[in-house]
């Protein structure tokens, strides 16, 4: 089920095409809320908010019973004249998302699991924020465009000016990209083609799991730490899997502190990682099989607030 909120007026759509129908009826600024279940993806041409029930397909979260899954690739093509903000929250997507047309400004991807995010053509992507997300393959916003990633797990990244804070980056190959920023992250070895950090980038209080001795050659400060890939304390962090929580342990938590003196990685800082959506979730919905003697039907609903 999908509900569309347009200035307080609620419309409801059903079935796997519910998102497509809700988006077609929406205007910029509207809110589309999706229940748990699978929905066919739709190209997004309006700066709307799309909120799902959660991204957690592993069911380790006690609030999100079932995830909201979007099926199929989709494009984001929002006109430069659209001044609204696109927000995607609480969804699981295992296809390709392409910024393909127009200009996307200040978009927010929140508490979602994505596979592949990229840009094509002349589309401009300005100040994309990715918070409490998982990206199982890669993210790229294209040369000259920008994104900040906060408390998120990223398999690897490509083009664009990227700022990473309290992230886990699982493939460090593109560290050579110019102008990036890395703070309080855990950054793993980049396969057979590992590179050092660009001299035009900045890096503070990051843990690098790498055998490249000169990895930090261009970073003159002494706040970063490199440990070899043979260090068993961190072996479990390497490689992407939806079931991994990427938590530090009592054995390795104090090896390096973040810029704020707290924990590095996705559970540190002021926005620690959580898969729980911010919108309230229906966690129990029971309807009696028959009415009472006086014609009443018993309905038992339990709602837990989001974060």
Q: Could you say what each language-model-derived stretch is?
A:
Residues 270-306:
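Surface beta-strand/loop "capping" patches
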Residues 36-38, 54-58, 208-215, 251-262:
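Acidic glycine-/aspartate-rich tracts in secreted/extracellular proteins
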Residues 40-47, 59-64, 198, 215-221:
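Short loop/helix-cap segments at secondary-structure boundaries that form the rim of catalytic
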Residues 2-38:
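Acidic Gly/Asp/Thr-rich repetitive segments characteristic of extracellular carbohydrate-active
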Residues 221-277, 281:
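C-terminal accessory segments
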Residues 48-100, 116:
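Right-handed parallel beta-helix/beta-spiral solenoid domain characteristic of secreted/periplasmic
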Residues 97-101, 116-244:
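Predominantly extracellular beta-rich ligand-binding scaffolds that present long acidic/polar faces
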């Amino acid at each position: 089920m999908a509900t569309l909120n347009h200035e307080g007026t609620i419309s409801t759509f059903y079935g796997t095409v519910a998102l497509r129908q809700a988006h077609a009826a929406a205007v910029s600024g509207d809110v589309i809320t999706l229940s748990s279940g699978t929905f066919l993806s739709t190209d997004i041409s309006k700066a709307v908010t799309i909120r799902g029930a959660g991204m957690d397909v592993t069911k380790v979260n006690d609030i999100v019973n079932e995830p909201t899954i979007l099926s199929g690739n989709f494009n984001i093509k929002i006109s430069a004249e659209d001044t609204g903000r696109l927000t995607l929250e609480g969804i699981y997507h295992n296809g390709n998302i392409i910024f393909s047309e127009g200009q996307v400004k200040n978009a927010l991807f929140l508490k979602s699991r994505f596979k592949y995010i990229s840009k094509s053509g002349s589309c401009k992507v300005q100040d994309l924020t990715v918070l409490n997300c998982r990206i199982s393959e890669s993210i790229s916003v294209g040369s000259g465009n920008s994104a900040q990633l906060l408390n998120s797990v990223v398999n690897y990244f490509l083009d664009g000016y990227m700022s990473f804070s309290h992230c886990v980056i699982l493939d460090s190959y593109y560290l050579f990209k110019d102008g990036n920023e890395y703070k309080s992250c855990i950054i793993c070895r980049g396969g057979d083609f590992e590179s050092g950090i660009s001299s035009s980038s900045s890096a503070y209080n990051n843990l690098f799991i790498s055998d490249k001795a000169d990895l930090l050659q261009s970073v003159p400060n002494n706040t970063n730490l490199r440990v070899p890939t043979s260090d068993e304390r961190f072996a479990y962090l390497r490689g992407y899997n939806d079931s991994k929580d990427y938590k530090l342990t009592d054995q390795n938590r104090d090896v390096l502190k973040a810029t704020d003196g707290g924990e590095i990685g996705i559970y540190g800082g002021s926005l620690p990682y959580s898969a729980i959506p911010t919108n309230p979730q229906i966690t129990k919905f029971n309807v009696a099989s028959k009415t009472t003697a006086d014609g009443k039907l018993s309905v038992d609903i339990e709602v837990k607030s989001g974060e």
